[in-house]
Regions:
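Structural signature of extracellular appendage/secretion-system components
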Residues: 1-196
């Protein structure tokens, strides 16, 4: 049998690696997987999954940016605009611990690095994702539900600094599903919600 066309087409549709959300970042990167149906679907799922995970985590553990540079006690300088925990607006678990526990944790890195500034203040510096290091990404296969929260649900950030229930945060969690700003594919620029 010399008909190898069907095998070749199946391999092309499957692709040669996993589709990632970075493949959907631009028309150029999308060109690397275009025509590989399975990789396209995997990349779109990665976009959806990571957006949901980051949205939920950002509500439980909101970030803000520093307005000025600061230096840590070990001599490292952090520029203005460094992303840190928004301590004033974050919820806490019943133990009041900072930083609060994120719902989904990455397998290779904590959400924050605790840094003591030369000004005596404690900063919780957000550890950004590195697209080249999979264990730092919020992606399928590189995250898990926070084990502390699985063991003791009361550690979930649901309380204000004064100990009262943070109902506003609950409203933000519900509203996150209605935000219409996600684009799954560079060729489909119509924004959608998590539910669409």
């Amino acid at each position: 049998n010399t008909d190898i066309g069907s095998i070749k087409s199946k391999l092309l549709v499957r692709g040669d690696t996993y589709g990632r959300r970075e493949d959907m970042a631009s028309e150029e990167s999308y060109g690397n997987i275009e025509g590989c149906t399975l990789m396209e679907v995997e990349a779109e799922l990665d976009v959806l999954f990571s957006r949901i995970v980051k949205s939920m985590n950002d509500i439980y553990c909101p970030n803000t940016e520093t307005t000025s540079a600061f230096t840590s006690t070990d001599g490292r300088t952090y520029p203005a605009g460094t992303k840190i925990l928004d301590e004033e607006n974050c919820a806490r678990g019943v133990d009041g611990e900072l930083p609060p526990r994120e719902l989904f944790t990455r397998i290779g890195i904590d959400r924050y690095t605790k840094v003591t500034g030369t000004d005596g203040k404690t900063y919780y510096v957000y550890n950004e994702e590195d697209p080249d290091v999979s264990s730092t990404r919020y992606a399928i296969g590189t995250i898990t539900v926070n084990s502390d929260l699985k063991r003791q649900i009361t550690l979930m950030p649901a309380y204000k600094k004064d100990g009262s229930v943070d109902y506003e945060m609950g409203a933000k969690l519900a509203a996150a599903w209605e935000v219409k700003d996600m684009k799954l594919n560079p060729y489909d620029q119509k924004p959608c919600t998590f539910e669409e």
